[in-house]
Amino acid sequence: MSKKIVTIIDVKNYVGQEVTIGAWVANKSGKGKIAFLQLRDGSAFFQGVAFKPNFIEKFGEEEGLAKFDTIKKLSQETSVYVTGVVKEDERSKFGYELDITDIEIIGESNDYPITPKEHGTDFLMDNRHLWLRSRKQVAMMQIRNAIIYATYEFFDKNGFMKFDSPILSGNAAEDSTELFETDYFGTPAYLSQSGQLYLEAGAMALGRVFDFGPVFRAEKSKTRRHLTEFWMMDAEYSYLTHDESLDLQEAYVKALIQGVLDRAPQALETLERDVELLKRYIAEPFKRVSYDEAIDLLQAHENDEDADYEHLEHGDDFGSPHETWISNHFGVPTFVVNYPAAIKAFYMKPVPGNPDRVLCADLLAPEGYGEIIGGSMREEDYDALVAKMNDLGMDTTEYEFYLDLRKYGTVPHGGFGIGIERMVTFVAGTKHIREAIPFPRMLHRIKP
């Protein structure tokens, strides 16, 4: 078979022409003189139709019957070259169909373990390397890819430079209880929790920088929102105000949603995501509310029928139920700003005139997805930062490079970070974060 391979997503450019597709058989059906193949190649899913009389006419009775019989006996995930004529088909969700004229088996797939029937989560996770091939998991990866693409596009357009922070570090970014420790030639080293501290050095050199890579948190959490290894985008910038930072974060999240709408609309359709709701999140301004206003709201509504959360006092941190209620109350992504300094990281800058609160923000996504962005202005004053670290009992000698940034030309600066997997689950409308990354690492799972 002479092969100029065309991807499924591009068949629309070949209507009326004969093409060859390299694909896998996702499913098959039919009876008698007709067979239907559901084909996938990573770019899209596509139906091919084979008619027995056409094969007999083209190849003669013996060879034509043999080829048609081969099609009817194809097993799930067999890899094939399929040749046929592309036709428009209004009945198809894809809009096109392939009138199959020839087929060649590349790799057999006998006893494929993930059949169309229902399987338990543990079984699917044990076979994650194969589960990734299913229609919904392909859609999740397409959405993830669109978000990553939109991230690079957004920051490039806004004057940010990609800056690579190290994954191995000699100190902790925030919580030392959640570190993965390893031996670095006789010296303790840690897998990165965040690239932020190094990114601040980048901002002092380059003005606006962003990092994108894996981070690691040794959290012993089994919730649907936590992974021990995930991908984070951190951005850091000099000379931006807190309000300008919130504007940037809002524009970024809207750009990510728009990027998925533009680049992966079929993935959203596969997952049955409410596209009109996503469009509303783009069209409407995000809500901004202070931490203290949020606490007041929670207290005022804690006896409501839908208030499935525990009582909080001013100074307490939010749990997932509180975040869910707040974002659902406003119906759009909501910034909660100016948290108590006591429950936030040491490097956050106090609110002018109110040292008990810091210039920070968490962006809470509606529909129960909770926090997707955390950010703050950083304390740029050397003496103030050292005093804060001393109050917390921190060893300042471990942060000499970080403190140097305040000694040599310090400037107002800030930044934020977003866990890509949380953004993927939010945009995709799925409930568990394990499906937002190819091979999830969780408390009790490190394989495959």
Curated annotation (Swiss-Prot):
Source species, domain of life: Bacteria
EC numbers: 6.1.1.22
Enzyme kind, highest EC tier: ligase
Annotated localization: Cytoplasm
Reactions the enzyme catalyzes: tRNA(Asn) + L-asparagine + ATP = L-asparaginyl-tRNA(Asn) + AMP + diphosphate + H(+)
Pfam families associated with the record: tRNA-synt_2, tRNA_anti-codon
Keyword annotations from UniProtKB, A to Z: Aminoacyl-tRNA synthetase, ATP-binding, Cytoplasm, Ligase, Nucleotide-binding, Protein biosynthesis
InterPro entries attached to this UniProt entry: Aa-tRNA-synt_II, aa-tRNA-synth_II, aa-tRNA-synth_II/BPL/LPL, Asn-tRNA-ligase, Asp/Asn-tRNA-synth_IIb, NA-bd_OB-fold, NA-bd_OB_tRNA
Gene Ontology molecular function terms on file: asparagine-tRNA ligase activity; ATP binding; catalytic activity, acting on a protein; nucleic acid binding; transferase activity
Family annotation (Gene3D superfamilies): Bira Bifunctional Protein, Domain 2 (3.30.930.10), Nucleic acid-binding proteins (2.40.50.140)
Gene Ontology CC terms: cytoplasm
Record carries keyword Hydrolase: no
Protein's UniProt keywords contain Protein biosynthesis: yes
Biological processes per GO annotation: asparaginyl-tRNA aminoacylation
Complexes and interactors: Homodimer.
CDD domains, A to Z: AsnRS_cyto_like_N, AsxRS_core
Name of the featured protein: Asparagine--tRNA ligase
Lineage: Bacteria, Bacillati, Bacillota, Bacilli, Lactobacillales
Family the UniProt entry places it in: Belongs to the class-II aminoacyl-tRNA synthetase family.
